Amino acid sequence: MLEAPPRNSEYLDDILCAIDKQYQLKFHYATPYGVEKDIMLSPAFVRLFKQRWYVIGVNENEQVRCLPFDRIAFMEVVCKRHPLSAKMKRLLTPDSFYDGCFGIMRMEDEQIENIRIRAFYPEYNLIEEVPLHESQQKVKESADGLYREYTLAVRPSRDFLQELLWHGRNIVVLKPESLKRQMIDILKDMMQSYETGECRNGEEDL
């Protein structure tokens, strides 16, 4: 039994055609905060992550945008060639744009970090069957087999932190210390949210 296809998957063929023919796409789009806007995009490639399709491209202001299909209310293919600039062509390939990334977010201010984690039995079997990231390498195993340690070269984006949290108490960050402290702070905020029922995600005043 397969999972249900991602929402608005019917746009995929038209978007791939626009990429191939270097056409632009016109979207009516809703942001995560409920703001609706019209966007003109020159698409470069698409990416599937956690049952959501995304189109990555350049808007009219030469800004890179990453738009999930499921927030598109209306889409039109503008059948007129509008090639990407040479600079954007070099940047906007999956390998170069997502170098060192996990998931869909590419934060300009997040540098690739050498991260060391510890995974406890039996969770380490899972992340060896389905690695967290292509750079994942096993570097240590305890004598009693209770844990294994791994290194990863990855940007610590929100997507990556959420993946670590998904594994719960079965994975802990060892290095760098800054990321370890960040994870501890997130867990403390989560605990306070559960205890008080109040928002602790940094967006309380929105």
Annotated model-derived regions:
Residues 61-95:
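Flexible linker/loop signature enriched in Pro/Ser/Thr and Pro/Gly
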Residues 32-34:
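Short acidic/polar, Gly/Pro-enriched loop/turn segments located at secondary-structure boundaries
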Residues 96-206:
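Polybasic (Lys/Arg-rich)
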Residues 38-40, 66-69, 116, 149-151:
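Well-ordered beta-strand positions in beta-sheet-rich domains
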Residues 1-30:
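Bulky hydrophobic/aromatic content
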Residues 51, 70, 144-146:
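Beta-strand-connecting loop/turn residues
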Residues 52-56:
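Short aromatic-glycine-enriched beta-strand elements
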